[in-house]
Amino acid sequence: MLTRLSKLSALMFLLGVSACKSPPPVQSQRPEPAAWAMEKAQDLQQMLNSIITVSEVESTG
């Protein structure tokens, strides 16, 4: 019984020591954004203004 307990204790000790010696996980860096995401955004307001124009108010009568 004592040898079984000592073997188990030795095994647990070795597992604990080996876990402490393992290197920490490497944190991966985020990849750079895609090229299209880095381009300047289009001026959609100007495009809408050229399509939609303010018309005269129609008279109801």
Swiss-Prot record:
Keywords from the UniProt entry: Cytolysis, Host cell lysis by virus, Host cell outer membrane, Host membrane, Lipoprotein, Membrane, Signal, Viral release from host cell
Gene Ontology CC: one annotated term: membrane
Signal sequence bounds: 1-28
Superkingdom, taxonomy of origin: Viruses
Functional summary from the UniProt entry: Component of the spanin complex that disrupts the host outer membrane and participates in cell lysis during virus exit. The spanin complex conducts the final step in host lysis by disrupting the outer membrane after holin and endolysin action have permeabilized the inner membrane and degraded the host peptidoglycans. Host outer membrane disruption is possibly due to local fusion between the inner and outer membrane performed by the spanin complex.
Family affiliation: Belongs to the caudovirales o-spanin family.
Protein name as catalogued: Probable spanin, outer lipoprotein subunit
Source species: Salmonella phage P22 (Bacteriophage P22)
